[in-house]
């Protein structure tokens, strides 16, 4: 149950934890593979891209790269918010996807410098202004992932609305 200081979208937010372990020890095929086990008990594999110039540094491309999981997390966070905002407003939303494209700095630490999020929202009688407001609320107020990434990246959005 929300306390008086929580907004409707906020979950109980306590500390999060995760253990990330390298899977590339002696006798394994993996070079730069990692497995993350989240505090909620889920497992996520990550791997690096092959590096032809420095084979010992590269991965085997067997799982998403760590920065891809960061980008995917931001997409999941904002899509979650948009669907929840629209559903709570009793709008007939039937689908939501977001395609993210990004640019990164050329030099270390190679942070994201630009991220574009192209939303495709499907529903009945949805008004673009309503969906755009839900997207803006997510980016400006609720989505901790995009708000953090916005400290280094210019984040832009687009919307394709599909009537069913």
Model-derived features with residue positions:
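Extended beta-strand/beta-hairpin segments
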Residues: 1-72, 83-164
């Amino acid at each position: 149950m929300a306390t008086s200081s929580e907004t409707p979208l906020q979950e109980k937010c306590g500390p999060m934890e995760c253990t990330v372990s390298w899977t590339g020890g002696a006798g394994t095929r993996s070079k730069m593979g990692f497995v993350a086990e989240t505090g909620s008990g889920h497992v996520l594999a990550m791997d690096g891209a092959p590096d032809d110039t420095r084979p010992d540094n590269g991965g085997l491309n067997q799982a998403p790269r760590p920065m891809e999981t960061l980008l995917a997390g931001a997409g999941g966070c904002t899509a979650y918010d948009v669907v929840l905002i629209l559903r709570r407003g009793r709008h007939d939303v039937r689908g939501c996807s977001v395609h993210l494209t990004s640019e990164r700095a050329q030099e270390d630490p190679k942070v994201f410098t630009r991220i574009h999020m192209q939303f495709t929202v499907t529903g009945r009688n949805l008004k673009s202004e309503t969906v755009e407001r839900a997207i803006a609320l997510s980016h400006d107020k609720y989505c901790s992932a995009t708000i953090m990434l916005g400290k280094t990246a210019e984040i832009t959005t687009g919307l394709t609305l599909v009537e069913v």
